[in-house]
């Protein structure tokens, strides 16, 4: 219970500190950012919580550990399927009502998963839990773009994302502890109950506003005619794939390449979790001075260098810890600026664009894990997973550079007379 209080205090502090960089935030706006941060914390717990309870889940339900691992994939499938469906068929409702519906799905999905006693029911529970994930980030970003003054939205979105980073740092260890001491069901029961509290915060703190930019179903797809959103989708997918090609194998890498003991992995995972928190915080802090494009492109470049160092210097314990920290910090430093770039390039279909970003993110996780696994299938050492990881992150950076070139060319082709006079 004490750890749960610490977690809630951490979310409140981070959301307030990062969100306050959005400038001109009154108490009401800070409560909106906090409410959305609580929502992303619940999503982070649900998405990654199964990783710490696989053994207990398999033994309790009577399935194999690989079959229990399928629950991670079912959640990702729910994200991929649910995000566009919700985005396309929610235009008649206010953004607040959409958020309430999404959090209600989180409650239902995690409650189903908690009470399941068969593989089929577990899978359905995970699918339902994943359905609202992408749309929540999209709707949350749109809400913030409407109540925060232009140029400060990136910091506000980073405040929203801070909940996800706290889930990685503190929430998942709490879930693992509950599973080991009591039952894995306690972990997901806690997530379901927590999301009821999130619903209350959305109801009382989020204003009832509409996305007036929505048109008919066909008009929501018009933004996809431009190469700009596709380049951002590519940057999102390749950027996440790059980090996950290495991070998916972080435990054997640290044990067999860097020489850490298995007992040290708890400290290492908390260290990289701290990197995620600080990376997201730094991204929000500098958003007032640099454009989202510059932040994202430079971050991808730093990740490429860090991954190359993990390949060449993995045998040095201190070095491997430093660059593991940098990689995971970079992963969440990318989140807010890429979300803003998608909103800027999805006029008329903002929710669909933001949902597409979450699809790209989850596809990146799958692509990255597969590419890293290929190195192991070839019989290479664990440090070789950092090579395809660096290549994928370089592809992400290249996509952003191509996007920047396209936008500059587009601006150059715009007639000067088209600019407003005065």
Residue ranges and their predicted role:
Residues 81-117:
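Conserved MFS/SLC helix-loop-helix module at the cytosolic interface between two early adjacent transmembrane helices
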Residues 83-94, 279-291, 376-377:
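Helix-to-loop junctions at the C-terminal end of transmembrane segments
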Residues 294-338:
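C-terminal transmembrane helical hairpin of 12-TM major facilitator-type secondary transporters
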Residues 345-381, 389:
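A late C-terminal transmembrane helix in Major Facilitator Superfamily
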Residues 109, 120-128, 318-326:
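Paired small-residue
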Residues 150-151, 155-204, 249, 253:
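Helix-loop-helix hairpin linking two adjacent transmembrane segments in secondary transporters
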Residues 125-163:
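Cytoplasmic helix-loop-helix junction between adjacent transmembrane helices
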Residues 62, 94, 115-121, 259, ...:
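Helix-breaking motifs and short loop linkers at transmembrane-helix boundaries and internal kinks
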């Amino acid at each position: 219970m004490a750890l749960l209080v610490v977690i809630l205090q951490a979310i409140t502090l981070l959301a307030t500190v990062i969100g306050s960089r959005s400038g001109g935030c009154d108490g009401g706006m800070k409560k909106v950012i906090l409410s959305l941060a609580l929502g992303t914390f619940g999503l982070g717990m649900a998405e990654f919580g199964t990783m710490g309870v696989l053994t207990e889940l398999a033994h309790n339900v009577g399935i194999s550990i690989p079959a229990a691992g399928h629950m991670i994939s079912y959640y990702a499938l729910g994200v991929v399927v649910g995000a566009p469906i919700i985005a396309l068929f929610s235009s008649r409702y206010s953004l607040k009502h959409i958020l309430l519906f999404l959090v209600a799905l989180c409650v239902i999905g995690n409650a189903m998963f908690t009470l399941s006693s068969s593989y089929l029911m577990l899978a359905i529970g995970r699918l339902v839990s994943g359905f609202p994930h992408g749309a929540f980030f999209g709707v949350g970003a749109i809400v913030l773009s409407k109540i925060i003054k232009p140029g400060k939205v990136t910091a506000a979105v980073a405040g929203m994302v801070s909940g996800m980073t706290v889930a990685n740092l503190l929430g998942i260890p709490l879930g693992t502890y509950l599973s080991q001491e009591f039952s894995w069901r306690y972990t997901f029961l806690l997530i379901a109950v927590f999301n009821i509290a999130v619903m209350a915060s959305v109801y009382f703190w989020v204003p009832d506003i509409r996305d007036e930019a929505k048109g008919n179903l066909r008009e929501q797809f018009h933004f996809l005619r431009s190469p700009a959103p596709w380049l951002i989708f590519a940057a999102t997918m390749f950027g996440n794939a790059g980090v996950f090609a290495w991070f998916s194998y972080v435990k054997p890498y640290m044990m067999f390449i860097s020489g850490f003991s298995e007992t040290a992995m708890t400290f290492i995972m908390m260290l990289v979790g701290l990197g995620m928190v600080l990376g997201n915080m730094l991204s929000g802090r500098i958003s007032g001075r640099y454009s989202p494009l510059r932040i994202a492109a430079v971050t991808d470049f730093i990740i490429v260098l860090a991954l190359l160092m993990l390949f060449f210097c993995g045998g040095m314990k201190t070095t491997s810890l430093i660059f593991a920290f940098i990689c995971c910090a970079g992963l969440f430093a990318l989140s807010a600026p890429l979300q803003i770039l998608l909103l800027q390039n999805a006029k008329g279909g903002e929710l669909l664009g933001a949902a597409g970003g979450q699809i790209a993110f989850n596809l990146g996780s799958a692509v990255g894990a597969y590419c890293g696994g290929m190195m192991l299938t070839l019989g290479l050492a664990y440090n070789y997973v950092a090579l395809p990881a660096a290549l994928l992150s370089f592809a992400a950076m290249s996509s952003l550079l191509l996007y920047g070139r396209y936008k500059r060319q587009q601006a150059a082709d715009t007639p000067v007379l088209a600019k407003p006079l005065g």
